[in-house]
A protein has these predicted regions:
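Cofactor-binding loop segments of dinucleotide-utilizing enzymes, especially the Rossmann-like FAD-
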Residues: 12, 93, 131
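NAD(P)H-binding glycine-rich loop region in Rossmannoid oxidoreductase-like domains
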Residues: 16-83, 94-99
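A short helix->loop->beta-strand "cap" motif at the edges of active sites that frequently abuts
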Residues: 82-87, 118-119
């Protein structure tokens, strides 16, 4: 915004109240699995930034890794190509691989799909995103996790393998602050 850009944001109707009023942003109400809403959001932009990531699924509501990490990314990548948008930035995740968890696999699949396009693409893989996104003193998940676990007298950094002191330092951390 400070550079004069006018972002368009695709926002689910049930999440509209979570979006702060930020001047020149155009809000499009819709779902990433609705190709029409995705296309409407992407028309007329210079670049697409895809940052969807869920940490748990709600299959009864079709909120799945497959639908959002991969299917939604494919819809956005395809809509960008159809609209002539040649710049695509994809937020993936640290530790993605084809044979990992559902989270890791679907993030990996979206990376592979994007890599096989003619777009000028950037993929970034944060391990955690931290900060106070709404400025209301309520930090999001990773900041709360830091407060509850890392600031303890005994740090607990090995979430994926439990507390195994011999494995300390054998994992990658790429934290990203919300301002970045």
């Amino acid at each position: 915004l400070a550079e004069g850009h006018s972002p368009k944001l695709l926002v689910r109707s049930e999440s509209i109240y979570k979006v702060p009023s930020v001047g020149d942003c155009e809000l499009i109400i819709g779902d990433v699995n609705d190709k029409g809403a995705v296309k409407k959001t992407i028309e007329g932009v210079d670049a697409v930034i895809y940052t969807i990531g869920i940490i748990r699924e709600f299959k009864s509501k079709d909120i799945t890794y497959e639908n959002l990490h991969f299917g939604g990314a494919v819809n956005a990548i395809d809509a960008a190509a159809e609209s002539g948008v040649n710049r695509f930035i994809l937020m993936s995740a640290n530790g993605v691989c084809p044979d990992g968890t559902g989270y890791q696999k679907t993030k990996w699949m979206s990376e592979q799909y994007l890599k096989n396009t003619d777009s000028k693409w950037t993929i970034f893989r944060p391990s955690t995103i931290f900060g106070d996104p709404r400025g209301n003193g309520r930090p999001e998940f990773c900041s709360q996790l830091k407060k509850d676990l890392i600031n303890l007298p005994l740090p607990a950094p090995l979430f994926h393998e439990g507390l195994v002191p011999f494995n300390a330092g054998n994992f990658s951390m790429s934290p990203v602050h919300i301002i970045d």
